[in-house]
Amino acid sequence: MTRVVLAAAYRTPIGVFGGAFKDVPAYDLGATLIEHIIKETGLNPSEIDEVIIGNVLQAGQGQNPARIAAMKGGLPETVPAFTVNKVCGSGLKSIQLAYQSIVTGENDIVLAGGMENMSQSPMLVNNSRFGFKMGHQSMVDSMVYDGLTDVFNQYHMGITAENLVEQYGISREEQDTFAVNSQHKAVRAQQNGEFDSEIVPVSIPQRKGEPILVTKDEGVRENVSVEKLSRLRPAFKKDGTVTAGNASGINDGAAMMLVMSEDKAKELNIEPLAVLDGFGSHGVDPSIMGIAPVGAVEKALKRSKKELSDIDVFELNEAFAAQLLAVDRELKLPPEKVNVKGGAIALGHPIGASGARVLVTLLHQLNDEVETGLTSLCIGGGQAIAAVVSKYK
């Protein structure tokens, strides 16, 4: 079977809600990365067979945001593109689709990833197409409803985390401790420049003066403690334990990678970073969607012909501290190998981009001693996706 390799992998900094990227469309964030990858690899843009990009909150951006990003990123009009929506798994699903297209021989070179600007998601006025006869009308927050609400139960993703808290007996202190550790690891990594190789700075033009250059993730917080987090009120139910402090944020960002057949990489003298070994997807009861990575991880390992003990580093999306703690109850992961640079609680969770973001961060950790990695994300609606990669040899 054709070996599929990852030849370049980058991400933007992750902006906080209403932060540096509030006026930057998702497709511009994606275009920045496409342009950078072309420049870094020296690849002829016309040699790219397809562009596949995850994006959840598409309303108001225009037709097919992936196509917009591709064209604005400097690709010729002959290169096709399409947009993927698998909620939080969109970015990783896009990479899986690229992988599948190469294995089947349909493509040789694909740009794949994810992008999201949650700050720009519009408010919707449903049923207003033909006007209102009388009475009060309300707006729907597309970010909350299309991105963060379980449509089957009509409640916020945070309630699915609370459901896992009850099922697995997870304490508030456990969650807050997990969140603090995520922040501390991210602070250390940021201060030591450990994200520098994966981040492409984004220049934001200003009406007056020089452009602003965004170089670092905005959500990383110093001086966070369990004591401080313990003062926060529950965010989703009166007697709950999930708070804004032990959950991922609402964020803006993008991540992208160059997916190729090994033969094409050799032909073009492009040195790959890693080999894609296999993927797994799984579904569960939507009310406990956060536990779905257990099944996805098991399937990805089986398809990659690996055991959990073979994995040197894990990058697992931290939708909620409770969610990842529940997954750990089942998989019993070695803590020293999990999210060693911090996770989404600290870095942020731009939903359509996160699937690619966790893989980008993982790839930049591979070396002669850290050769095999696994990444996974839970997905609203009761799903999950996982992938296993190995350092290219």
UniProtKB/Swiss-Prot annotation:
PANTHER family linked: ACETYL-COA ACETYLTRANSFERASE, CYTOSOLIC, ACETYL-COA C-ACYLTRANSFERASE
GO cellular component: cytoplasm
GO function terms (MF aspect): acetyl-CoA C-acetyltransferase activity
InterPro entries listed in its UniProt record: Thiolase (IPR002155), Thiolase-like (IPR016039), Thiolase_acyl_enz_int_AS (IPR020615), Thiolase_AS (IPR020610), Thiolase_C (IPR020617), Thiolase_CS (IPR020613), Thiolase_N (IPR020616)
Reactions accelerated catalytically: 2 acetyl-CoA = acetoacetyl-CoA + CoA
PROSITE patterns named among the record's database cross-references: THIOLASE_1 (PS00098), THIOLASE_2 (PS00737), THIOLASE_3 (PS00099)
Main location: cytoplasm
Keyword Transferase: yes
Protein name (Swiss-Prot/TrEMBL): Probable acetyl-CoA acyltransferase
Enzyme class, first EC level, given as a word: transferase
Keywords of this entry: Acyltransferase, Cytoplasm, Transferase
Active site as annotated: C88, H349, C378
Organism annotation: Staphylococcus aureus (strain N315)
Annotated family: Belongs to the thiolase-like superfamily. Thiolase family.
Compartments, as annotated in UniProt: Cytoplasm
Any single Pfam family the record assigns to this protein: Thiolase_N
EC numbers for this chain: 2.3.1.9
